[in-house]
């Protein structure tokens, strides 16, 4: 593990930072002479003129630390020597005292050069909003829930995140797509018609009468008891138990009277899905409700729906139609456990009209029918008794903003909008530029609403909106790279909300208050507690723990027949809620490695073999030791994203643990080394294959680190189930643990356990967790680095290591609390400087 900075190193850093340019050059020359002597005696046989292992030649490596590429080579040398990996153990090494003196000198040189670059160039280059940030910024700025992310090109990833400036390039495709996205979002702000009150209640019987295909269900997986519909299976997707589809987009109130039957006193898990595809998309699950036995219960909620969408109800713990009637089963009515639906009701839209977005863009400008707006713009009088409008009339005469003073209104609205969009005060000359765009459009007889949307669109596609600009605070002369208050507000907002600063942040920025530690801490707390704070958990944890990849693989149904959509939905929720709880309660970050609790529902608990968890709703559960669970490593979502749909790989999982949990990513494999393909015949075990692989010198040095955590996790299959043996494709079937009645083919025994690079043996994942927990500082170091990368949009640089070690020390003092670490990151030099 990476060693902490010693006092001698810190002292050297201070002294080296004070050295002037010419003196620094002399020190570099002195270091180069010192290093050359060591290199000739101990390094050039592998890294010299005749042989350059890892592409590194040390006898000619200049001490030009100001050059980024050269400095990067020196950092590799420093890290390998510091870890004791070089020179190799079977080679003669220089005296320890000589090595340490050299390392102290090298660290100081690298730190000084890196810090100098940061103080002159800044550590974060200009970065654009990624597509998630662009969408959330539009939503918050315009007050709309429009989905524009899908219109934008995928973002590249660097250092584990998609908001790192170095990877966020800009192409012509981006510029075109940003225009499309801005246009789509802006168009949703202007309603084409006033809302039409809509309310419809359907009894269970009426649900079946609305679609003739229900006749196929009745008498099989469903039946009627008077007006009540009893569902004993989950219907096919084209036979929904659903509300009426809504006529227009908006927020709707949904209610239903339901109860469970035949459940032996236990609740039945019911899901509500928003969809126009009849509930097939688990990503759009609105809620899970536990429905009690026999007692009619009113379930209600308020949900945003698009036109023609409806809300589908289904008993999620009921069998599917295929499970009930497929595979040669008799096609007869089934009874027993079921969901009784007395009625469903939908009402809305219940939003405030016009929506907040319209008020933000057109405050004080009334909405009128297009014909009336044209008359107002032309100065013609309106008819004294206009005909009463019907909903259909707005199809050919939609509502538009109608201004009697378009030039004055355009200037007023734009000058108010631009500082919000650009996240800081806007120079008058720049404001005039956007005002002129709209005035020119008005002069060309463009309707007022269209002219304003043109001005807004140009602003939302401008560099001032697309890029996060971070000017320094000119008033703080003692710190040439200190961010100004508006830059701090923006950095904090995109860190915690993935979006633009709100009014409170901008007001504090205007007063210069955000440079005060107590104010910054209070704002961090406020933002984490805000509903928008969920975006930090979703976007940071989604990338750190690879939850975004949960859909990347589909378990083979012939091998993992127990995998279903209920389990799939529950997997990432466990990890997301687990992350949220550690952050909310400032729990120690060691809980990410091991905990005696997690968030489960009945489906996930059954999968884990944990008893006494009833119902579909997720809740905090005490874990049993026998379950071998606790922390993120043993959660089904993580075990799924680190495997393919058929088999596991100790290499993939081991690499994941090194990168994500330990923060010690292995070097990429040599280009001429083939990947290991598991022997699907079962003749050769994965350990035997890896042992052979490790006989290659180029592979052994990395695999001694990769393989131990990988084999520690081999007792978990591709969907996170515990296993003592691999599944085969033939042979004698045995019953699958935790799934009574389900059979699988038994293969070879699972190979688990191993030995750490330091020679410490471990039996299984429970043992290996203790290996990780023995170095809490490294766990803190890893998370500190990842938070710094994500919060600033730049990878860790050498000068940042000093700050990272300061964060680790503070974390140790605060018992490794995760929320405390996040606060310290926000207060750090790296976060508050360009």
Predicted regions: what they are:
Residues 9-21:
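Bacterial N-terminal signal peptides
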Residues 1-7:
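N-terminal secretory signal peptides that target proteins for export/translocation
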Residues 26-56, 69-76, 80-85, 89-834:
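Low-complexity, glycine/serine/threonine/alanine-rich intrinsically disordered linker
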Residues 60:
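Active-site donor-binding loop signature of nucleotide-sugar glycosyltransferases
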């Amino acid at each position: 593990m990476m060693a902490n900075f010693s006092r001698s190193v810190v002292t050297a850093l201070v002294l080296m930072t004070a050295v002037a340019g010419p003196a620094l050059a002399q020190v570099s020359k002195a270091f180069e002479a010192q290093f050359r002597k060591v290199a000739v005696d101990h390094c050039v046989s592998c890294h010299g003129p005749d042989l350059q292992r890892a592409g590194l030649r040390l006898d000619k490596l200049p001490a030009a630390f100001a050059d980024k590429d050269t400095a990067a080579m020196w950092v590799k040398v420093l890290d390998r020597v510091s870890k004791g990996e070089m020179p190799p153990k079977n080679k003669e090494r220089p005296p320890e005292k000589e090595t340490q003196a050299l390392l102290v000198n090298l660290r100081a040189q690298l730190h000084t050069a890196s810090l100098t670059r940061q103080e002159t160039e800044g550590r974060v280059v200009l970065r654009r909003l990624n597509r998630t940030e662009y969408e959330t910024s539009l939503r918050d700025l315009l007050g709309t829930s429009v989905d524009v992310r899908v219109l934008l090109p995928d973002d590249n990833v660097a250092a584990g995140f998609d908001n790192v400036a170095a990877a966020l390039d800009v192409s012509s495709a981006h510029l075109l797509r940003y225009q499309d996205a801005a246009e789509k979002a802006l168009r949703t702000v202007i309603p084409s018609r006033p809302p039409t009150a809509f309310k419809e209640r359907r009894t269970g019987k009426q649900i079946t009468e609305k679609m003739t295909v229900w006749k196929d269900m009745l008498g099989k997986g469903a039946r009627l008891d008077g007006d009540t519909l009893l569902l004993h299976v989950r219907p096919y997707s084209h036979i929904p138990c659903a509300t009426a589809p809504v006529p227009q987009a908006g927020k709707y109130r949904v209610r239903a009277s339901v109860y469970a039957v035949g459940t032996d006193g236990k609740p039945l898990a019911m899901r509500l899905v928003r969809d126009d595809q009849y509930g097939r998309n688990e990503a759009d699950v609105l809620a899970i409700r536990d429905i009690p036995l026999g007692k009619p219960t009113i379930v209600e909620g308020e949900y945003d729906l698009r036109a023609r969408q409806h809300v589908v109800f289904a008993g999620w713990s009921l069998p599917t139609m295929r499970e009930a009637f497929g595979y040669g089963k008799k096609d007869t009515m089934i009874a027993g456990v079921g969901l009784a639906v007395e009625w469903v009701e939908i009402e809305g839209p219940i939003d405030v009209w016009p929506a907040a977005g319209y008020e933000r863009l057109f405050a004080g400008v009334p909405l009128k029918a297009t014909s009336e707006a044209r008359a107002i713009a032309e100065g013609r009088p309106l008819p004294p008794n206009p005909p009463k409008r019907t909903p259909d009339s707005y199809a050919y005469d939609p509502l538009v903003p109608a201004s009697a003073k378009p030039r004055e209104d355009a200037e007023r609205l734009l000058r108010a909008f631009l500082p919000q969009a650009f996240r800081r005060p806007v120079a008058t000359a720049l404001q005039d530029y956007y005002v002129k765009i709209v005035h020119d459009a008005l002069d060309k007889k463009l309707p007022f609403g269209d002219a304003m949307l043109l001005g807004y669109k140009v602003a939302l596609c401008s560099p001032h909106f697309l890029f996060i600009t971070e000017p320094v605070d000119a008033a703080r002369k003692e710190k040439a790279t200190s961010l100004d208050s508006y830059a701090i507000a923006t950095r904090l907002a995109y860190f915690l909300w993935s979006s633009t600063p709100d009014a409170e942040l901008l007001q504090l920025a205007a007063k210069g208050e955000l440079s005060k530690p107590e104010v910054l801490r209070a704002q961090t707390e406020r933002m984490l507690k805000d509903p928008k704070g969920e975006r930090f958990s979703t976007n940071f944890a989604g990338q750190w723990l690879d939850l975004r990849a949960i859909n990347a693989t589909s378990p083979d149904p012939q091998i993992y027949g127990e995998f279903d959509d209920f389990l799939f939905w529950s997997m990432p929720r466990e990890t997301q809620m687990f992350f949220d709880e550690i952050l909310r309660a400032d729990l120690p970050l060691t809980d990410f490695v091991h905990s005696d609790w997690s968030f489960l529902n009945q489906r996930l608990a059954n999968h884990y073999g944990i008893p006494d968890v009833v119902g579909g709703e997720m809740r905090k559960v005490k874990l049993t030791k026998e379950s071998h669970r606790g922390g993120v490593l043993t959660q089904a979502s993580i075990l799924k994203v680190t495997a393919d749909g058929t088999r596991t790989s100790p290499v993939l999982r081991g690499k994941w643990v090194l990168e994500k949990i330990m923060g010690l990513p292995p070097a990429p494999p040599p280009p001429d080394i083939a990947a290991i393909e598991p022997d699907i015949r079962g003749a050769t075990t994965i350990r035997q294959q890896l042992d052979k692989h490790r006989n290659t010198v180029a592979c052994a040095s990395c695999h001694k680190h990769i393989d131990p955590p990988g084999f520690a996790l081999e007792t978990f299959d591709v969907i996170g189930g515990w296993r003592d043996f691999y599944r085969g494709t033939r042979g004698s079937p045995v019953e699958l643990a935790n799934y009574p009645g389900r059979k699988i083919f038994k293969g070879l025994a699972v190979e688990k356990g191993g030995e750490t690079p330091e020679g410490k043996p471990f039996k299984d994942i429970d043992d290996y967790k203790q290996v990780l927990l023995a170095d809490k500082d490294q766990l803190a170091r890893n998370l500190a680095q990842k938070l710094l990368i994500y919060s600033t949009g730049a990878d860790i640089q050498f000068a940042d290591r000093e700050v990272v070690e300061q964060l680790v020390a503070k974390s140790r003092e605060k018992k490794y609390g995760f929320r405390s670490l996040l606060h310290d990151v926000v207060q750090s030099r790296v976060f508050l400087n360009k």
